[in-house]
Every structure is written in C-alpha cells, then in structure tokens.
C-alpha cells in the first residue's frame, strides 16, 4: 500500500484531502508546514507528496525544490495543490520540480486520478 504525505497549513483542507486519499485505499500521513514535512520525509520517505504553496516556515516551492534536489528523495512524485491558479504559478511550480499541479478548488476524481497515475 502506498503512503502519501499531505502538507497544508489548513487543517480543514489537509483533512479533506487525507480523507479522499484514504477512501481511495492509500495510507496517509500529514504535516502542517514545510519544516514538519521535511523532518517526516527524512525519517520515513513517503511514496508521494501533495503540498500547498502558501505555508509558514517553508513554503511549498521551497519544499518541492528540496525534495527534488536531495538524492535520496528526488524520485518521490510531488503534486502541488494550491489556490494560486495563474499560469505563472503553475509554471513556477513545475520549474521547482513538481510532477503535477492541481488548482483548488478541485474535483475529487482529478486528485485521485493524478495520485494514482504518479504512483504507477
């Protein structure tokens, strides 16, 4: 069973995404910011990370860049899930190494299909 780390400073959104992934049969762990996520990834690397951009301490762009520039974690797929929906935001997220970019609000089916596709 695959493990997904959901990183969002909003507990409501974090729990909503986690619930969606749990229903899809995935194991889910959660972090409230980039620093907590980094510590969790170093301790037990997940199979995939879903992260927000705007967070305290370490934003999603910084976390994505760290994941993709660290030899032991660079193969972990990253999905940026953010309310920042401008074309530049999507471009910048992908430039940081994200494997997918989903804009909030999103359709649950889109999140599940993107996660499952990247876990193959």
Label each PLM-derived region with a short phrase.
Residues 106-115:
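C-terminal output helix
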Residues 55:
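Receiver (REC) domain active-site loop signature in two-component systems and cognate sites
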Residues 15-23:
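Charged docking surfaces used in two-component/phosphorelay signaling
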Residues 25-32, 40:
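Short hydrophobic/Thr-rich beta-strand motif most characteristic of the beta2 strand and flanking loop
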Residues 44-50:
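Active-site beta3 strand of CheY-like receiver
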């Amino acid at each position: 069973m695959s493990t997904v780390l959901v990183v969002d400073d909003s507990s409501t959104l974090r729990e909503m995404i986690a619930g969606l992934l749990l229903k899809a049969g995935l194991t889910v762990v959660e972090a409230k910011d980039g620093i907590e996520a980094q510590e969790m990834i170093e301790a037990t690397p997940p199979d995939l990370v879903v992260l927000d951009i705007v967070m305290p301490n370490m934003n999603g762009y910084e976390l994505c860049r760290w994941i993709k520039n660290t030899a032991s974690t660079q193969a972990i797929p990253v999905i940026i899930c953010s309310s920042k929906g401008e074309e530049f935001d999507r471009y910048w997220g992908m430039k940081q190494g994200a494997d997918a970019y989903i804009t909030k609000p999103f359709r649950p089916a889109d999140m599940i299909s993107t996660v499952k596709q990247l876990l193959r």
